[in-house]
């Protein structure tokens, strides 16, 4: 293969590889925060048949805000999520293994929209801020240890 072809073909393969792993299966605006790890998203330009979805962040667990396990830490986690996500646009990497959890919520890793492209991993941000713990639920495609080191 001539060097000029290699120079053209190599970047093309790199772009394809990057696109395959891009966390932009869905994009939308967060319309409601339920608790630290659950919120509603109004989708834009998605391949999903739903316009408004409820999202449960993959492989993390925030303290509870309701019921017998409700605590101040749960309220703090909810406030953190609300301050970062409410009325903002995010990108979602949706679970390709099962899609939804037992409560009909889409399981996803969320990324902040930074300049119109996927930016910081919000699941990781919650853990790093001390508002969530990693829980590697094996019924989804994600490996939290790959993004939380």
Predicted regions: what is each one?
Residues 1-2:
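N-terminal secretory signal peptides that target proteins for export/translocation
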Residues 5-11, 15-149:
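Small beta-barrel nucleic-acid-binding modules, primarily SNase/OB-fold domains
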């Amino acid at each position: 293969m001539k060097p000029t072809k290699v120079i053209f073909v190599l970047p093309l393969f790199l772009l394809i590889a990057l696109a395959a792993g891009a966390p932009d299966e869905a994009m939308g605006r967060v319309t409601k925060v339920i608790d630290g790890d659950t919120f509603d998203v109004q989708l834009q330009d998605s391949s999903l048949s739903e316009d408004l979805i409820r999202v449960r962040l993959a492989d993390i667990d925030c303290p509870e805000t309701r019921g017998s396990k409700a605590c101040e830490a749960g309220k703090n986690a909810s406030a953190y999520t609300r301050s970062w996500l409410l009325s903002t646009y995010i990108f979602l990497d949706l679970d390709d293994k099962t899609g939804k959890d037992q409560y009909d919520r889409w399981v996803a890793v969320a990324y902040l929209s930074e300049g119109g492209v996927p930016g910081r991993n919000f699941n990781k941000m919650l853990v790093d801020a001390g508002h969530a713990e990693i829980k590697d639920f094996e019924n989804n495609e994600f490996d939290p240890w790959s993004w939380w080191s």
